From Swiss-Prot:
Pfam family, one: Ribosomal_L14
UniProt organism field: Campylobacter curvus (strain 525.92)
This protein's encoding gene: rplN
Family classification: Belongs to the universal ribosomal protein uL14 family.
Biological process, per Gene Ontology: translation
Keywords attached to this entry: Ribonucleoprotein, Ribosomal protein, RNA-binding, rRNA-binding
Protein name (record): Large ribosomal subunit protein uL14
Lineage: Bacteria, Pseudomonadati, Campylobacterota, Epsilonproteobacteria, Campylobacterales
One Gene Ontology term of the molecular function aspect: large ribosomal subunit rRNA binding
Top-rank lineage group of the source organism: Bacteria
Amino acid sequence: MIQSFTRLAVADNSGAKELMCIKVLGGSKRRYATLGDVIICSVKKALPNGKIKKGQVVKAVVVRTKKEVQRGNGSLIRFDENAAVILDNKREPIGTRIFGPVGREVRYANFMKIVSLAPEVL
């Protein structure tokens, strides 16, 4: 469950290390984002030689949340951290590698490139 001012780790090799959520996309009153949702973020920490610089405003898709998500079959899934993958304007990942597992809900949100790059889909 991601909302404004939530800090997230970056799960790709774009050069950013930490993001802060600015806005949850999908309606004017939408407060929370979960797995597979697109958010607007500010880069808070970045590597000096990366593609993404500190202070940039980027779009990202949430791939891991600490708050558990209930699946259709009744099972719950949660992760150890909040993490996101940075997207470009065509909703494709900027990085070429994805680190750590991603939730299956990312596939249902039609981010197939992220699913194919991920080492594990839970």
